A protein has these predicted regions:
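Glycine-rich portal/gate segments that line the openings of hydrophobic small-molecule binding cavities
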Residues: 49-110
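Hydrophobic ligand-binding cavity/cleft-lining segments
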Residues: 1-47
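Short coil/turn motifs at secondary-structure junctions
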Residues: 23, 81-83, 94-96, 132-134, ...
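A short acidic/glycine-rich loop-to-helix N-cap element
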Residues: 101-107, 113-118, 143-164
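Short, P/G- and charge-enriched loop/turn segments at secondary-structure junctions
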Residues: 3-4, 109-117, 126-127
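Hydrophobic pocket/interface hotspot
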Residues: 27-28, 37, 60, 78, ...
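Short, highly charged C-terminal tails/helix-capping segments
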Residues: 173-177
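Hydrophobic/aromatic beta-strand elements that line small-molecule binding cavities or substrate pockets
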Residues: 18, 49-50, 74-80, 122-131
Length: 177
């Protein structure tokens, strides 16, 4: 069964909430197992490679590939990890292409930001996992340094990308159960 993704904004955050028809331990595993994560990370039509040392302070490297073959590398590290409950990732997209950064910067300016204030600061992504109705409620909270950066990411399709990723995660969970 597929569910909708609820997307909201709060302060400098994008908040995404999605129910998955799978046990919490399995959903959490899909976020920390590099093989499973590579199967669903990125918008629909994208593929991914993942390397992850899943421990607090451990490094992570994810690269999404568009259907046209453009690479979107993301580096970072893990923050707080509470098995089956909380996963925090500090994600750095500074290695994305110049074209991607120009698009984000344009969205940042359109959202009211001054060009000289644009930055590619890392984004804290906090994921919580809760039992809900025989499945799992996942809440993803991405915290940006400024609301204008949040709005720029939404304008470039962050919400649509996450929804597509979650659709792919549904499929991974269905075949794993």
């Amino acid at each position: 069964m597929s569910f909708d993704t609820h997307i909201a904004t709060e302060a400098n955050d994008i908040v995404l909430i999605r129910h998955f028809d799978a046990p919490r331990a399995l959903v959490f595993m899909a976020w920390i197992d590099p093989v499973m994560l590579a199967e669903w990370w990125g918008p629909e039509g994208f593929t991914a490679t993942v390397e992850a040392d899943v421990r607090e302070g451990g490094e992570m490297s994810l690269t999404m590939y568009s259907p046209e073959g453009e690479a979107y590398p993301i580096g970072g590290h893990f923050g707080e990890i509470v098995p089956n409950e909380i996963l925090v990732m500090i994600m750095d997209a500074s290695r994305h292409s110049a074209g991607w950064h120009e698009a984000i910067k344009a969205g940042f300016v359109d959202a009211g930001g001054r060009p000289e204030d644009y930055n590619a600061d890392p984004i804290e992504t906090r994921v919580t996992f809760e039992d809900e109705g025989g499945g799992t409620k996942v809440t993803v909270r991405q915290t940006f340094t400024m609301a204008t950066m949040r709005d720029a990411h939404l304008k470039l399709g962050s919400g649509v990308g996450w929804s597509g990723s979650f659709n792919k995660l549904d499929a991974v969970l269905a075949k794993t159960r």
